């Protein structure tokens, strides 16, 4: 953080606050006093040497409290008339026309100028306001003059047109490759662009294109990948824009108080996109999206602290400086990371209000500021409406930023948690700007929640992490902007707050008692005790290289459970060149979600399992034992961290796994690495396959070779292979039985050489599945005897033969 820049912010906000205060514009004054206080808090964190900084913070916050009653009593300024709004839309049309004009998009510019002229003339005839008429006519003349000047070259004979006078308008072709949305702050140039994110940095395969096309339709609406052509999206119209998909479905709580849909100009006479990005200003209402609002809050805090466009960069239209701007025509575009790529979400600016005219969606405490409500609306549209089933910050932050999600469970039997190591890691990474953090509570009784001031299963934004003389603290924000922690170090704790600690944490309990803004300090020990999960989102810019593969796992491929066989699981080869000093490689598995019910009742438990098998296919889950085993969770994102300490080449097999495979899933595997690597799907070397359906029944259920009297009664198949080549044989039987098979050479054509054998088996008998892979089986005739371990174990089985050479198979017995 830059202390000097934050001091400048504080001075600017304080000046604006005092100015608005004197003008009687109390709502705006409250907003700027809060921002000035927040800027000073961050400045002190960054090492500011300003004198009396704590006194100034207290002064601003006390003035906020004093102004609250004035805000309630003061009547709002009159709203703009329809004709004034038409003038604003005409100005915006001309502004957009100027932009197209500068880019030499002549036809688009002429169209926008012409529409501005028509709107100005129409409105000037409708209004009796002479001043407004003059403004409209002047704007119409300017637009008309420029439109005529641009039209002249288009009307000249073809032979007289200069080769440089008018550029042909390129066709609006959408390529298959999404715009490199750059969620990676300060990404090194060597980073492999998402435009070409298969294993070798080539273009998408046909399968990947089909995956991205299929998962573009979310809750019945198509959200196409965000591409370069979308930067030319049209935002200016003579009439207010209306989303062709209609109004968003409301939640049950919204419906009880809903009155109507309004546009920003119906709420304020001075709507703007962003006054300043601030976590203090965000307020959640009755939509059940606490994790999303918490995600917005920490993204805003990050943008403020590190001056990186983490959240404001995703809203369009934008001005020439890349700043999002208010559009009086009511159309906006938000770029969200969904189902493998950044995607384009179009919304209008209609928002729900109650009978008092209060917004029923999240909003900024500065009522003229729109960014909070509009980003929330875009996300709610994708999620199927304001009747949002709820989420977690891993999902929401990934959608907003594209950063890498990680989940730390503090009370899990399957995941170890170290309080000391975790705090040290969070403290260091948070202050470096490497990570965004939220914390969520688990289930608790109403009495427990009331006692501690906590909301069950609720997400809180982490705004700060501090350590003071062995004491460790986390600053949290409740997205509701009220209701705070009531335990140790709350504003009402008279025992633990010392003057020294108050100064270090910039916290005055007496001032905090006057204003409940939902922001509080909690000790690390108490957070670990009363909260359930910490959600992290890591800056991908920490890794200089990355690539991804989009794919599909068909529900028909393999058994429902992969507890005994991984033969049908998607598998990938990862080869890493580890330098001296070691390196980190992270692998993110993301399941694509296209339906609100799937999102609300996620029953797909996915994970990634890592094996050290030199990139060869793995068939048995525990043989060899996993290098890194996965925990199957019903979250769409699963992060695997591989830490390398030894220099050289390391080769892994990555296996996608599910607890119970019920449905076909589409997914993305994305690899992030601090060093060079290659990543590819493990291909099958076999081009031919045959399946034999058999069964053990009655006498033919003879058991293994230990039972000599009955083993000879097992089914026997004979296969004939004409040329030497690789062969894979797989046996699948009832999971409750241990199965195996034996291959016996009957005869070979010529000298079999080193590949010849008398007998080979599938090894130890295993539950439900076994296999034998021969790199080179000599040409000849062979018998295969499948069996269960014990006699009299009846049931069906499948024998699968996979090869590159035709095989003839007959049943002998």
UniProtKB/Swiss-Prot annotation:
Residues the record lists as Phosphothreonine modifications: 95
Entry annotation: catalytic residues: 290, 458, 478
SMART domains associated with the record: calpain_III, CysPc, MIT
Main location: nucleus
GO biological process annotation, one example: self proteolysis
Residues in Calpain catalytic domain copies: 232-540
Gene Ontology, cellular component aspect: centrosome; cytosol; extracellular exosome; nucleus
GO molecular function, one term: MIT domain binding
Top-rank taxon, per record: Eukaryota
InterPro entries associated with the record: Calpain_cysteine_protease (IPR022684), Calpain_domain_III (IPR022682), Calpain_III (IPR022683), Calpain_III_sf (IPR036213), MIT_dom (IPR007330), MIT_dom_sf (IPR036181), PalB/RIM13_Calpain-like (IPR051297), Papain-like_cys_pep_sf (IPR038765)
Chain intervals for the UniProt region annotation (Domain III): 541-701
Tissue: Ubiquitous.
Keyword vocabulary terms for this entry: Acetylation, Hydrolase, Nucleus, Phosphoprotein, Protease, Repeat, Thiol protease
Family: Belongs to the peptidase C2 family.
Function: Calcium-regulated non-lysosomal thiol-protease.
Protein name stated in the entry: Calpain-7
Organism for this UniProt entry: Homo sapiens
Lineage of origin: Eukaryota, Metazoa, Chordata, Craniata, Vertebrata
Gene name as annotated: CAPN7
């Amino acid at each position: 953080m830059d202390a000097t820049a934050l001091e400048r912010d504080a001075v600017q906000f304080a000046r604006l606050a005092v100015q608005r205060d004197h003008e009687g514009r109390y709502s705006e004054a409250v907003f700027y006093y809060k921002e000035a206080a927040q800027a000073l808090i961050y400045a002190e964190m960054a090492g500011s040497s300003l004198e009396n900084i704590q006194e100034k913070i207290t002064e601003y916050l006390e003035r906020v409290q004093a102004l609250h009653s004035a805000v309630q009593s003061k009547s709002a300024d009159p709203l703009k008339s329809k004709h004034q709004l038409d003038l604003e839309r005409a100005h915006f049309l001309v502004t957009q026309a100027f932009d197209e004009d500068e880019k030499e998009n002549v036809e688009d510019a002429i169209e926008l100028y012409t529409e501005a002229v028509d709107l100005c003339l129409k409105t000037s005839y409708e209004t009796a306001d002479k001043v407004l008429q003059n403004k409209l006519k002047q704007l119409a003349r300017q637009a008309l003059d420029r439109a005529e000047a641009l039209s002249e070259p288009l009307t000249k004979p073809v032979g007289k047109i200069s080769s440089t006078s008018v550029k042909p308008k390129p066709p609006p072709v959408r390529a298959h490759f999404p715009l490199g949305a750059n969620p990676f702050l300060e990404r090194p140039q060597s980073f492999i662009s998402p435009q070409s994110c298969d294993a070798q940095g080539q273009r998408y395969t046909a399968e990947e294109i089909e995956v991205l096309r299929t998962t573009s339709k979310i809750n019945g609406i198509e959200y196409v990948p965000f591409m370069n052509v979308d930067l030319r999206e049209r935002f200016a119209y003579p009439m207010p824009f209306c989303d062709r998909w209609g109004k968003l479905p409301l939640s049950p709580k919204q419906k009880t108080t809903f009155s109507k849909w309004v546009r920003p100009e119906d709420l304020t006479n001075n709507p703007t996109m962003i006054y300043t990005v601030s976590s203090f200003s965000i307020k959640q209402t009755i939509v059940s999206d606490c994790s999303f609002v918490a995600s917005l809050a920490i993204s805003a805090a990050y943008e403020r602290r590190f001056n990186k466009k983490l959240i404001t960069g995703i809203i369009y239209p934008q001005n020439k400086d890349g700043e999002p701007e208010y559009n009086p025509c009511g159309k906006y575009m938000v770029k969200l990371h969904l189902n493998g790529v950044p995607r384009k979400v179009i919304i209008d600016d209609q928002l729900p209000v109650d009978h008092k005219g209060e917004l029923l969606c999240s909003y900024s405490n500065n009522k003229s500021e729109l960014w909070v409500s509009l980003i929330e609306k875009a996300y709610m549209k994708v999620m199927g409406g304001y009747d949002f089933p709820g989420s977690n910050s891993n999902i929401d932050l990934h959608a907003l930023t594209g950063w890498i999600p990680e989940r730390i469970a503090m009370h899990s039997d399957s995941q170890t948690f170290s309080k000391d190591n975790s705090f040290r890691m969070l403290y260091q990474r948070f202050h470096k700007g490497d990570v965004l953090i939220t914390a969520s509570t688990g289930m608790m009784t109403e009495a427990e929640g009331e006692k501690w001031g906590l909301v069950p299963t609720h997400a809180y934004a982490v705004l700060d992490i501090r350590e003071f003389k062995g004491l460790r603290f986390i600053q949290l924000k409740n997205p509701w902007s009220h209701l705070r922690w009531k335990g140790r170090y709350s504003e009402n704790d008279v025992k633990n707050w010392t003057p020294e600690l108050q100064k270090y944490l910039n916290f005055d309990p007496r001032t905090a008692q006057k204003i409940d803004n939902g922001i509080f300090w909690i000790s690390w020990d108490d957070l670990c005790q009363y909260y359930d999960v910490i959600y992290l989102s890591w800056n991908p810019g920490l890794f200089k290289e990355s690539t991804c593969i989009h794919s599909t796992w068909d529900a028909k491929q393999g058994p429902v459970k992969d507890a005994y066989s991984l033969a049908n699981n998607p598998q990938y080869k990862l080869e890493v060149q580890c330098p001296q000093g070691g390196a980190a490689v992270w692998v993110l598995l993301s399941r694509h979600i296209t339906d609100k019910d799937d999102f609300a009742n996620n029953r797909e438990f996915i994970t990634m399992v890592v094996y050290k098998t030199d990139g060869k296919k793995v068939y048995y889950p525990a043989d060899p034992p996993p290098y890194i085993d996965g925990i199957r969770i019903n979250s769409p994102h699963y992060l695997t961290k591989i830490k390398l300490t030894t220099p050289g080449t390391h080769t892994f097999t990555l296996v996608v796994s599910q607890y119970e495979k019920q449905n076909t899933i589409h997914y993305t595997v994305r690899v992030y690495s601090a060093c060079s690597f290659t990543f590819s799907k493990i291909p099958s070397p076999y081009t031919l396959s045959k399946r034999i359906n058999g069964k053990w029944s009655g006498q033919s259920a003879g058991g293994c070779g230990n039972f000599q009297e009955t083993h000879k009664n097992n089914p026997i198949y004979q296969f004939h292979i004409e040329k030497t080549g690789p062969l894979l044989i797989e046996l699948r039987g009832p999971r409750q039985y241990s199965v195996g098979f034996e291959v016996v050479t009957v005869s070979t054509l010529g000298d079999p050489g080193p590949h010849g054998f008398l007998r080979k088996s599938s090894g130890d008998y295993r539950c439900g599945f076994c296999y034998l892979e021969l790199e080179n089986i000599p040409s000849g005739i062979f018998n295969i005897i499948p069996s269960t371990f014990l006699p009299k174990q009846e049931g069906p089985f499948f024998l699968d033969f996979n090869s590159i050479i035709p095989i003839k198979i007959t049943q002998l017995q």
